[in-house]
Amino acid sequence: MTLKIGTRGSKLATTQAGTIRDQLKYFGRDAELHIVTTPGDVNMSPVERIGVGVFTQALRDVLHAGECDVAVHSMKDLPTAADPRFHLVVPTRADSREALIARDGLTLAELPEGAKVGTSAPRRISQLKAIRPDLEILPLRGNIDTRMGKVTSGELDAVMLAYAGLTRVGMQDRATEVFDADIIMPAPAQGALAIECRADDTETVRALNMLMHADTFVSAVAERTVLNRLEAGCTAPVAAHATLDGYSGDTMTLTAGVYALDGSDQLVFSAEGDGARPEELGELVAQQLIDAGAANLLGDRS
């Protein structure tokens, strides 16, 4: 049986899903893409206005209805609460860092005063304003080509995108600066894909399990536990970044931050823990943020 892989129709989404299709074929399972239009692809309002899960719910509905066998999501877009209807697999993560695409090859520090920078993500807005309060931050939606086209056309001086997305579509050379997590921290699970099938589809569960990457899975779980514990959605100004000890992978370091949208304040905490117990580490760092007053920064975005 040929597996139908549900995916959004953008260039990035189909490239991501195509990678999963090719991996399944490598392991002997024939697969093809099944394009699904989601409300988030039609409504160009800022994501925080449309609602959490806008990109994932339509795919999950199609999957649950049996119209496809597999759904491919960007893991950072998934609601943090587990859905027992589905089996989740997380393949190897791409580079999780944030990237700037600016005119004339400029870096963030080199952008002129009052430069226009496009992004709609509160997490990016708040961190950009903390570094460069003079910048004019403008809302930005659309696919990668549309976003970068606003720089090419001169409408914007720069845009902020996930470096993973640029890399997946072969446009990483367009980045004029890539930020380490201690400069601009990425979203929880940024760069990771979430692959779902119906939990009772045992044959497809077995096929997808061959794609699981344990280090990516536990890192994403730790990061998303922070989001869940803070009761914050994927559009909240919350960032997290987990790393595993390069030698043994036994020790995980998790850093997470909560930011005031105007860039005036931030809370950032780190802790080390057992890499095999990512939820506990996520709970620990989240509690540090809560005790320090994270709710005051999140406000009604929690």
Swiss-Prot record:
Binds 1 dipyrromethane group covalently. Transmembrane segments: none annotated. One of its GO terms (molecular function) is hydroxymethylbilane synthase activity. The modification S-(dipyrrolylmethanemethyl)cysteine is found at residue 234. It comes from the Bacteria. It catalyses: 4 porphobilinogen + H2O = hydroxymethylbilane + 4 NH4(+). SUPFAM superfamilies: Periplasmic binding protein-like II (SSF53850), Porphobilinogen deaminase (hydroxymethylbilane synthase), C-terminal domain (SSF54782). Its EC number is 2.5.1.61. Pathway: Porphyrin-containing compound metabolism; protoporphyrin-IX biosynthesis; coproporphyrinogen-III from 5-aminolevulinate: step 2/4. Keywords: Porphyrin biosynthesis, Transferase. One of its GO terms (biological process) is protoporphyrinogen IX biosynthetic process. Its cofactor is dipyrromethane. The keyword Transferase applies. Gene3D superfamilies: Periplasmic binding protein-like II (3.40.190.10), Porphobilinogen deaminase, C-terminal domain (3.30.160.40). The keyword Transferase applies. GO terms for cellular component: cytoplasm. Monomer. Belongs to the HMBS family. The porphobilinogen subunits are added to the dipyrromethane group. Tetrapolymerization of the monopyrrole PBG into the hydroxymethylbilane pre-uroporphyrinogen in several discrete steps. NCBIfam families: hemC. This is Porphobilinogen deaminase. It comes from Corynebacterium glutamicum (strain R). The gene is hemC.
